Amino acid sequence: MNFFFFTIFLLISFSTNSMNLFNKSLSNSEEFFTEWEYISDNVMGGVSSGKATILKDTDNFFLRLEGNVSTKNNGGFIQVRSSKEIVSDNFKGIKLKVSGKPSEYYIHIRTKFLLMPWQYYAGKFSVDKEWKYVEVYFEDFKKSNFYQPSAFSATDIKSVGFVAYGKDFEAELNIMEAELF
């Protein structure tokens, strides 16, 4: 009996501190998109186009953000975004399992202190054709405007978006896993 409690204690002690950002299963597209929404620069007059879909790679489902990002008409983004409520400050960044068309992509975080829709914090990462893990630390996120607070904590986060942004290109970002760590 003591061995059982000791084993449980060890498992709890050595468990990683993480939070899955894909609360809804990727295997159920309809349910998943009740939490995550596709948004483009069309909301502000831009001409980028794209979509977010759920696909399957062998045995694993993943989210794909794809489309044509255009900087015409002051645009230049497509994204998939979800509101989040994070109750712990014990996180230091976001870890993703990604692949896609080789390019730079972004994580956009909005906090409860950002009131205007063009305000966010951006964390940059690169993808390749092969699946890989990337970690983007909160301390490496850049604020979009000079008048924003310089830093944020996990409990300040209001939404998380995965974004193809800032240049004219054909985007294809695949995300199999997304978690706070």
Where are these regions (language model features)?
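Sec-dependent signal peptide recognition
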Residues: M1-I8
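Hydrophobic h-region of N-terminal signal peptides that target proteins for export
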Residues: F9-N17
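Beta-rich carbohydrate-recognition modules and glycan-binding surfaces
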Residues: T16-F181
